[in-house]
Each structure stands twice: as C-alpha cells, then as structure tokens.
Amino acid sequence: MNPIAAKQPRGMKKSSKMSRAFLLKLELRSHPTLLCVIRGALEPLMEMLGFSDEYNRAIIRAVDEAVSNIMRHSYHGRLDQPIEVYCNRLQRRTNGETEKGVEILLFDCGAAVDTTKLPARPLDEIKPGGLGLHIIRGSMDTVEYKRAGRLNRLRLVKYARSSKGGCGSAEGEPS
C-alpha cells in the first residue's frame, strides 16, 4: 500500500479547479538519480500543454529544485523515502482572457518544514547554496507549503501569460 496517498492525496481538498484524474502521477523514492525521471516526464507534458520552451525549462527547474530540497532537507539524504508528484491542468479568467496553466503537487512524509526559517538569502551574497527558494519562487506564480498530519504538501502553479520568471510568450500559451 502506498504510504503517502491512495487514490487522492491526503490533505488535498477537491476543488472545482481540479478533476479527479491527474494528467500525471509519479511515485518515486528520494534518490537523486531519479530526478531525471521527473524531468523526463515533465518535459513532454509541458510541451503537450503548449508551454513555450522557456516556460518548460522554468517549470522543470523549479520542480527539480523542490524535489531536491525534499530529498536533502525533509528526508535528510535518506534514499528510500516516498515522494509523489501530481500534475493537473488549470485555467483562470483574468481581464476577460482565459489563462491556461499547470498545477504541480509534491507530497512527502519527511520532516516538517519551518517556513519561518526559509527566507531566501540575498542574491548579492556570494556563497554556494541557498538559491533554491529564489529559483522556485522566481519561476512559479504560486508556491504554497502546507503540513497536514505527517504529510508535507508543496503546491506549485504556473500560468502561460505570467510575467513571473521572465519566461514564455503569448505564442507559448497552452492549448
């Protein structure tokens, strides 16, 4: 039995924005060599949704960084812990226009994250590490973390017409 989720991730409320069937569901272990599996699955999905190459790269970079953070900080480097990734198509109306996007949900059962200790470090500080949150927040329109019981949930959202992250173009809108 899957330790994180059965059919619907625990702690996730059903909303009108989400259908019961996800476009993509991945279950993997917290081994860094599996990051390429996530990247390999997301790239054609983002292309299928019609995201431009720039958006595609930004989304994959953010998810890759988020999953790396789960492996390093939530699971403290343990290589056999479960991580689940769910992707779903989104749509919203803004200024009379329909914007299409993607929602990516990441679930793990690792240590809770103290969000008060997560401010991104100043970019002018020259030292390795600490840019992960900056990359994630700069690439995505919405970044939401929630702890529900023993489950961590990270919700990442990107819309095609977003100016955040400097990615994409009008022709890169999902169809």
Where would I find each of the regions flagged by the language model?
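STAS-typified acidic loop motif
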Residues: 23-37
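Structural signature of the histidine kinase catalytic ATP-binding subdomain
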Residues: 30, 51-54, 78
